[in-house]
Amino acid sequence: MGMAFTDVLITETDATVTIVDKHFAPGGHWNDAYPFVRLHQPSSFYGVNSRALGKNTKDTTGPNAGLYELASKTELVTYFNRVMNEQFLPSGRVCYLPNSEYIADGLIRDITSGVKTRVENQKTVDATYMNVTVPAVTAPSYEIEQGVQCIPPNELPNLTNAPDGYVVIGGGKTAIDACLWLLNNNVNQEKILWIRPRDQWILDRAYIQPGPEFADRILLRQVETFEIAAASTSLNQMFNQLVTQGILLQLDAAIQPTMFRCCTVTAQELDQLRQIRNVIHGHRVERIELDNLILNNSIQSTSPGTIYIDCTSNGLARRPVRPIFEGNHLTLQTVRTCQQVFSAAFIAHVDAAYENEDTKNELCTWHSYMEGQYYRMR
Protein backbone atom coordinates (compact mmCIF):
# COMPACT_ATOMS: atom_id res chain seq x y z
CA MET A 1 0.00 0.00 0.00
CA GLY A 2 2.89 2.35 0.73
CA MET A 3 4.19 2.36 -2.84
CA ALA A 4 0.72 2.82 -4.33
CA PHE A 5 0.22 5.82 -2.04
CA THR A 6 3.63 7.27 -2.88
CA ASP A 7 3.08 6.84 -6.62
CA VAL A 8 -0.03 9.03 -6.64
CA LEU A 9 1.39 11.53 -4.16
CA ILE A 10 4.51 12.32 -6.21
CA THR A 11 2.40 12.43 -9.38
CA GLU A 12 -0.19 14.88 -8.08
CA THR A 13 1.94 17.00 -5.72
CA ASP A 14 5.52 18.22 -5.39
CA ALA A 15 5.98 16.40 -2.07
CA THR A 16 9.08 14.40 -1.21
CA VAL A 17 8.74 11.00 0.45
CA THR A 18 10.92 8.83 2.68
CA ILE A 19 9.90 5.16 2.54
CA VAL A 20 10.95 3.12 5.57
CA ASP A 21 10.88 -0.61 4.82
CA LYS A 22 11.69 -3.53 7.13
CA HIS A 23 12.27 -5.69 4.06
CA PHE A 24 15.54 -5.74 2.16
CA ALA A 25 13.84 -4.82 -1.13
CA PRO A 26 10.59 -3.31 -2.42
CA GLY A 27 7.56 -5.59 -2.57
CA GLY A 28 6.51 -5.86 1.06
CA HIS A 29 5.12 -9.24 2.10
CA TRP A 30 5.58 -10.59 -1.43
CA ASN A 31 9.26 -10.97 -0.55
CA ASP A 32 8.25 -13.51 2.11
CA ALA A 33 5.49 -15.29 0.20
CA TYR A 34 5.67 -18.91 -0.98
CA PRO A 35 7.21 -19.31 -4.46
CA PHE A 36 4.06 -20.64 -6.14
CA VAL A 37 1.78 -17.84 -4.97
CA ARG A 38 -0.20 -15.87 -7.55
CA LEU A 39 -2.63 -13.03 -7.27
CA HIS A 40 -6.23 -14.17 -6.92
CA GLN A 41 -7.33 -11.22 -9.05
CA PRO A 42 -6.15 -10.08 -12.48
CA SER A 43 -2.78 -8.36 -12.55
CA SER A 44 -4.29 -5.15 -13.92
CA PHE A 45 -6.23 -4.73 -10.65
CA TYR A 46 -2.96 -4.52 -8.74
CA GLY A 47 0.20 -2.42 -8.80
CA VAL A 48 0.66 1.35 -8.77
CA ASN A 49 -1.41 3.76 -10.83
CA SER A 50 1.36 5.05 -13.10
CA ARG A 51 2.64 1.68 -14.31
CA ALA A 52 0.62 -1.32 -15.43
CA LEU A 53 1.35 -4.68 -13.85
CA GLY A 54 1.50 -7.49 -16.40
CA LYS A 55 0.94 -7.46 -20.14
CA ASN A 56 -2.87 -7.28 -20.12
CA THR A 57 -3.08 -10.73 -21.69
CA LYS A 58 -5.21 -13.79 -20.97
CA ASP A 59 -3.93 -17.14 -19.85
CA THR A 60 -4.21 -19.82 -22.52
CA THR A 61 -3.55 -22.88 -20.36
CA GLY A 62 -4.31 -24.10 -16.86
CA PRO A 63 -7.34 -23.46 -14.66
CA ASN A 64 -7.26 -19.72 -15.41
CA ALA A 65 -7.41 -20.20 -19.19
CA GLY A 66 -9.54 -17.59 -20.92
CA LEU A 67 -9.20 -15.14 -18.04
CA TYR A 68 -6.71 -12.34 -17.54
CA GLU A 69 -3.27 -13.18 -16.19
CA LEU A 70 -2.47 -13.54 -12.48
CA ALA A 71 0.93 -12.19 -11.49
CA SER A 72 3.35 -14.60 -9.82
CA LYS A 73 5.60 -13.82 -6.87
CA THR A 74 8.56 -13.29 -9.19
CA GLU A 75 6.56 -10.91 -11.36
CA LEU A 76 5.33 -8.93 -8.35
CA VAL A 77 8.72 -8.53 -6.70
CA THR A 78 10.32 -7.60 -10.04
CA TYR A 79 7.55 -5.10 -10.74
CA PHE A 80 7.91 -3.27 -7.43
CA ASN A 81 11.68 -3.22 -7.79
CA ARG A 82 11.31 -1.57 -11.19
CA VAL A 83 8.83 0.98 -9.88
CA MET A 84 11.30 1.90 -7.15
CA ASN A 85 14.48 1.92 -9.22
CA GLU A 86 13.15 3.17 -12.54
CA GLN A 87 10.57 5.69 -11.32
CA PHE A 88 10.70 6.63 -7.65
CA LEU A 89 14.44 7.00 -7.07
CA PRO A 90 15.25 8.70 -10.41
CA SER A 91 12.61 11.33 -9.59
CA GLY A 92 14.88 12.65 -6.86
CA ARG A 93 11.86 13.01 -4.58
CA VAL A 94 11.81 9.57 -2.97
CA CYS A 95 14.32 8.29 -0.43
CA TYR A 96 14.16 4.53 0.16
CA LEU A 97 15.45 3.05 3.43
CA PRO A 98 15.36 -0.77 3.30
CA ASN A 99 16.12 -2.96 6.32
CA SER A 100 14.87 -0.15 8.51
CA GLU A 101 12.13 0.40 11.05
CA TYR A 102 10.25 3.52 12.06
CA ILE A 103 10.34 4.15 15.80
CA ALA A 104 8.49 7.44 16.40
CA ASP A 105 8.68 11.19 15.84
CA GLY A 106 10.78 10.87 12.69
CA LEU A 107 13.30 8.49 14.29
CA ILE A 108 14.37 5.58 12.07
CA ARG A 109 16.64 2.66 13.00
CA ASP A 110 18.71 0.71 10.49
CA ILE A 111 18.05 -2.93 11.41
CA THR A 112 21.42 -4.15 10.10
CA SER A 113 23.72 -1.56 11.67
CA GLY A 114 21.59 -0.26 14.51
CA VAL A 115 22.30 3.30 13.42
CA LYS A 116 19.46 5.70 14.15
CA THR A 117 18.52 8.63 11.94
CA ARG A 118 15.96 11.36 12.42
CA VAL A 119 14.11 12.89 9.47
CA GLU A 120 12.01 16.03 9.37
CA ASN A 121 8.56 15.41 7.94
CA GLN A 122 5.24 17.19 7.62
CA LYS A 123 3.14 14.03 7.67
CA THR A 124 3.56 10.42 8.72
CA VAL A 125 1.80 7.72 6.70
CA ASP A 126 1.36 4.32 8.35
CA ALA A 127 1.24 1.72 5.58
CA THR A 128 1.64 -1.16 8.06
CA TYR A 129 -1.70 -0.92 9.85
CA MET A 130 -3.38 -3.64 7.77
CA ASN A 131 -0.69 -5.93 9.21
CA VAL A 132 -0.37 -8.35 6.30
CA THR A 133 1.46 -11.48 7.47
CA VAL A 134 2.51 -14.72 5.81
CA PRO A 135 3.33 -18.13 7.38
CA ALA A 136 7.04 -17.91 6.55
CA VAL A 137 7.53 -15.10 9.07
CA THR A 138 4.74 -15.89 11.55
CA ALA A 139 5.04 -18.61 14.16
CA PRO A 140 2.04 -20.95 14.48
CA SER A 141 -0.27 -20.25 17.42
CA TYR A 142 -0.31 -23.93 18.44
CA GLU A 143 2.30 -26.07 20.17
CA ILE A 144 4.53 -28.36 18.11
CA GLU A 145 6.29 -31.38 19.62
CA GLN A 146 9.95 -31.78 18.79
CA GLY A 147 10.42 -33.94 15.70
CA VAL A 148 7.13 -32.96 14.07
CA GLN A 149 7.50 -31.79 10.48
CA CYS A 150 5.50 -28.55 10.40
CA ILE A 151 6.41 -26.23 7.54
CA PRO A 152 5.15 -23.06 5.87
CA PRO A 153 4.00 -23.44 2.24
CA ASN A 154 7.34 -21.93 1.15
CA GLU A 155 9.05 -25.25 1.84
CA LEU A 156 6.73 -27.47 -0.18
CA PRO A 157 8.75 -27.25 -3.42
CA ASN A 158 11.89 -28.22 -1.47
CA LEU A 159 10.61 -31.60 -0.26
CA THR A 160 12.73 -34.49 -1.49
CA ASN A 161 10.66 -37.46 -0.28
CA ALA A 162 6.94 -38.14 -0.25
CA PRO A 163 5.59 -38.21 3.34
CA ASP A 164 2.95 -40.52 4.79
CA GLY A 165 0.44 -37.75 4.29
CA TYR A 166 -0.17 -34.02 4.35
CA VAL A 167 -2.21 -31.99 6.83
CA VAL A 168 -3.12 -28.51 5.61
CA ILE A 169 -4.01 -26.22 8.52
CA GLY A 170 -6.10 -23.14 7.73
CA GLY A 171 -9.15 -22.13 5.74
CA GLY A 172 -8.01 -19.06 3.82
CA LYS A 173 -6.36 -18.23 0.50
CA THR A 174 -3.00 -19.64 1.54
CA ALA A 175 -4.54 -22.99 2.45
CA ILE A 176 -6.38 -23.07 -0.89
CA ASP A 177 -3.12 -22.41 -2.71
CA ALA A 178 -1.35 -25.15 -0.75
CA CYS A 179 -4.10 -27.68 -1.50
CA LEU A 180 -4.11 -26.81 -5.20
CA TRP A 181 -0.32 -27.09 -5.33
CA LEU A 182 -0.46 -30.57 -3.80
CA LEU A 183 -3.20 -31.72 -6.17
CA ASN A 184 -1.43 -30.24 -9.19
CA ASN A 185 1.70 -32.13 -8.17
CA ASN A 186 -0.11 -35.47 -8.27
CA VAL A 187 -0.69 -35.94 -4.55
CA ASN A 188 -3.65 -38.27 -4.10
CA GLN A 189 -6.50 -36.41 -2.41
CA GLU A 190 -6.77 -39.27 0.10
CA LYS A 191 -3.30 -38.32 1.35
CA ILE A 192 -4.50 -34.82 2.25
CA LEU A 193 -6.25 -33.89 5.50
CA TRP A 194 -7.56 -30.33 5.52
CA ILE A 195 -8.21 -28.64 8.87
CA ARG A 196 -10.59 -25.75 8.21
CA PRO A 197 -11.50 -23.91 11.44
CA ARG A 198 -13.70 -21.62 9.35
CA ASP A 199 -14.94 -21.76 5.79
CA GLN A 200 -14.93 -18.68 3.61
CA TRP A 201 -17.21 -17.28 0.97
CA ILE A 202 -15.46 -17.35 -2.40
CA LEU A 203 -16.02 -15.41 -5.61
CA ASP A 204 -16.01 -16.73 -9.17
CA ARG A 205 -12.97 -15.20 -10.85
CA ALA A 206 -14.76 -15.23 -14.21
CA TYR A 207 -16.86 -12.34 -12.90
CA ILE A 208 -13.90 -10.32 -11.63
CA GLN A 209 -12.25 -9.36 -14.88
CA PRO A 210 -11.15 -6.20 -16.68
CA GLY A 211 -11.76 -5.59 -20.35
CA PRO A 212 -14.87 -4.61 -22.34
CA GLU A 213 -15.63 -8.21 -23.28
CA PHE A 214 -16.52 -8.93 -19.64
CA ALA A 215 -18.26 -5.64 -18.87
CA ASP A 216 -21.86 -6.62 -19.61
CA ARG A 217 -21.95 -9.82 -17.60
CA ILE A 218 -20.10 -8.26 -14.68
CA LEU A 219 -22.52 -5.34 -14.57
CA LEU A 220 -25.48 -7.72 -14.73
CA ARG A 221 -23.93 -9.77 -11.91
CA GLN A 222 -23.63 -6.65 -9.74
CA VAL A 223 -27.22 -5.67 -10.45
CA GLU A 224 -28.37 -9.18 -9.59
CA THR A 225 -26.39 -9.09 -6.34
CA PHE A 226 -27.98 -5.85 -5.18
CA GLU A 227 -31.45 -7.00 -6.21
CA ILE A 228 -31.07 -10.15 -4.13
CA ALA A 229 -29.79 -8.16 -1.14
CA ALA A 230 -32.64 -5.66 -1.41
CA ALA A 231 -35.31 -8.36 -1.68
CA SER A 232 -34.02 -10.51 1.18
CA THR A 233 -35.66 -10.39 4.59
CA SER A 234 -32.83 -12.17 6.43
CA LEU A 235 -29.12 -12.82 6.08
CA ASN A 236 -29.68 -16.53 5.57
CA GLN A 237 -32.16 -15.89 2.79
CA MET A 238 -29.73 -13.51 1.10
CA PHE A 239 -26.76 -15.86 1.33
CA ASN A 240 -28.79 -18.85 0.16
CA GLN A 241 -30.00 -16.93 -2.88
CA LEU A 242 -26.51 -15.65 -3.67
CA VAL A 243 -25.24 -19.23 -3.57
CA THR A 244 -28.12 -20.49 -5.71
CA GLN A 245 -27.30 -17.92 -8.39
CA GLY A 246 -23.58 -18.72 -8.26
CA ILE A 247 -22.67 -15.26 -7.01
CA LEU A 248 -21.07 -16.68 -3.88
CA LEU A 249 -19.25 -20.00 -3.88
CA GLN A 250 -18.53 -22.35 -1.00
CA LEU A 251 -16.25 -25.34 -0.69
CA ASP A 252 -18.84 -27.47 1.08
CA ALA A 253 -22.56 -26.96 0.54
CA ALA A 254 -23.24 -28.32 4.04
CA ILE A 255 -21.03 -25.77 5.80
CA GLN A 256 -22.09 -22.13 6.18
CA PRO A 257 -19.01 -19.91 5.68
CA THR A 258 -18.29 -17.32 8.35
CA MET A 259 -15.66 -15.16 6.69
CA PHE A 260 -14.96 -13.36 3.45
CA ARG A 261 -11.44 -12.36 2.41
CA CYS A 262 -11.92 -11.63 -1.31
CA CYS A 263 -10.63 -15.03 -2.38
CA THR A 264 -11.46 -16.04 -5.96
CA VAL A 265 -11.32 -19.35 -7.81
CA THR A 266 -12.26 -20.68 -11.21
CA ALA A 267 -14.81 -23.45 -11.66
CA GLN A 268 -11.97 -25.89 -12.34
CA GLU A 269 -10.14 -24.95 -9.16
CA LEU A 270 -13.32 -25.28 -7.11
CA ASP A 271 -13.87 -28.77 -8.50
CA GLN A 272 -10.28 -29.68 -7.59
CA LEU A 273 -10.65 -28.43 -4.02
CA ARG A 274 -13.87 -30.34 -3.54
CA GLN A 275 -12.00 -33.55 -4.36
CA ILE A 276 -10.42 -33.33 -0.91
CA ARG A 277 -12.84 -35.31 1.23
CA ASN A 278 -10.79 -35.57 4.40
CA VAL A 279 -11.82 -32.26 5.95
CA ILE A 280 -12.25 -31.36 9.62
CA HIS A 281 -14.52 -28.34 10.02
CA GLY A 282 -14.83 -25.93 12.92
CA HIS A 283 -11.92 -27.23 14.97
CA ARG A 284 -8.71 -25.41 15.84
CA VAL A 285 -5.32 -27.01 16.28
CA GLU A 286 -3.94 -26.72 19.82
CA ARG A 287 -0.94 -29.04 19.63
CA ILE A 288 0.76 -31.32 17.13
CA GLU A 289 2.42 -34.46 18.48
CA LEU A 290 4.33 -37.13 16.57
CA ASP A 291 1.32 -39.46 16.53
CA ASN A 292 -1.59 -37.16 17.28
CA LEU A 293 -3.15 -33.93 16.15
CA ILE A 294 -4.73 -32.30 19.20
CA LEU A 295 -7.72 -30.15 18.31
CA ASN A 296 -9.74 -27.96 20.67
CA ASN A 297 -12.30 -30.71 21.28
CA SER A 298 -10.99 -33.85 19.61
CA ILE A 299 -7.87 -35.85 18.80
CA GLN A 300 -6.90 -37.02 15.31
CA SER A 301 -4.43 -39.89 14.99
CA THR A 302 -1.57 -39.27 12.56
CA SER A 303 1.95 -40.62 12.07
CA PRO A 304 5.51 -39.30 12.52
CA GLY A 305 5.84 -39.33 8.73
CA THR A 306 3.10 -36.73 8.28
CA ILE A 307 3.94 -33.24 7.07
CA TYR A 308 1.87 -30.37 8.44
CA ILE A 309 1.53 -27.24 6.33
CA ASP A 310 0.85 -24.16 8.44
CA CYS A 311 -1.46 -21.72 6.62
CA THR A 312 -2.85 -19.99 9.70
CA SER A 313 -1.22 -16.56 9.55
CA ASN A 314 -3.74 -13.75 9.31
CA GLY A 315 -3.15 -12.34 5.84
CA LEU A 316 -5.45 -9.42 6.61
CA ALA A 317 -5.77 -8.83 10.31
CA ARG A 318 -8.99 -7.42 11.68
CA ARG A 319 -7.96 -4.08 13.13
CA PRO A 320 -9.85 -1.53 15.24
CA VAL A 321 -11.57 1.18 13.24
CA ARG A 322 -9.72 4.48 13.21
CA PRO A 323 -9.94 7.59 11.03
CA ILE A 324 -7.61 7.52 8.04
CA PHE A 325 -6.80 11.22 8.38
CA GLU A 326 -5.83 12.41 11.87
CA GLY A 327 -3.96 15.68 11.72
CA ASN A 328 -0.51 14.99 10.31
CA HIS A 329 -0.93 11.23 10.65
CA LEU A 330 -2.46 9.03 7.93
CA THR A 331 -3.36 5.38 8.49
CA LEU A 332 -3.76 3.49 5.22
CA GLN A 333 -6.75 1.14 5.25
CA THR A 334 -9.10 -0.42 2.73
CA VAL A 335 -11.71 1.99 1.39
CA ARG A 336 -12.73 -0.08 -1.64
CA THR A 337 -13.90 -3.69 -1.43
CA CYS A 338 -11.05 -6.15 -2.05
CA GLN A 339 -8.76 -3.42 -3.42
CA GLN A 340 -5.96 -2.58 -1.00
CA VAL A 341 -3.57 -0.92 -3.44
CA PHE A 342 -6.34 1.05 -5.15
CA SER A 343 -7.43 2.18 -1.70
CA ALA A 344 -3.95 3.49 -0.92
CA ALA A 345 -3.79 5.33 -4.24
CA PHE A 346 -7.24 6.82 -3.69
CA ILE A 347 -6.30 8.01 -0.20
CA ALA A 348 -3.25 9.76 -1.66
CA HIS A 349 -5.42 11.47 -4.27
CA VAL A 350 -7.88 12.66 -1.63
CA ASP A 351 -5.04 13.97 0.52
CA ALA A 352 -3.65 15.88 -2.44
CA ALA A 353 -6.98 17.24 -3.69
CA TYR A 354 -8.77 18.30 -0.49
CA GLU A 355 -7.85 20.44 2.49
CA ASN A 356 -10.62 19.76 5.01
CA GLU A 357 -9.96 16.72 7.19
CA ASP A 358 -13.64 15.93 7.73
CA THR A 359 -14.17 15.91 3.97
CA LYS A 360 -11.20 13.60 3.50
CA ASN A 361 -12.47 11.13 6.08
CA GLU A 362 -15.96 11.28 4.65
CA LEU A 363 -14.60 10.35 1.22
CA CYS A 364 -12.37 7.63 2.69
CA THR A 365 -14.67 5.53 4.85
CA TRP A 366 -12.91 2.52 6.33
CA HIS A 367 -14.08 -0.83 4.99
CA SER A 368 -13.80 -4.09 6.94
CA TYR A 369 -13.68 -7.74 5.92
CA MET A 370 -16.42 -10.11 6.92
CA GLU A 371 -16.17 -11.97 10.20
CA GLY A 372 -19.22 -13.96 11.23
CA GLN A 373 -22.27 -13.68 9.01
CA TYR A 374 -22.35 -9.93 8.58
CA TYR A 375 -20.58 -8.22 5.73
CA ARG A 376 -20.97 -4.57 4.89
CA MET A 377 -20.83 -4.18 1.12
CA ARG A 378 -19.34 -1.01 -0.29
Over which residues does each language-model region extend?
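Long, internal scaffold/assembly segments composed of regular secondary structure
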Residues: 216-222, 226-310
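Rossmann-like dinucleotide/flavin-binding elements
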Residues: 1-13, 155-206, 342-378
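Glycine-rich dinucleotide-binding loop and its adjacent helix/turn
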Residues: 66, 72, 76-79, 128-186, ...
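Short hydrophobic core segments
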Residues: 20, 117-133, 166-169, 303-315
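Feature captures the FAD/FMN-dependent oxidoreductase FAD-binding
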Residues: 60-134, 262, 269-295
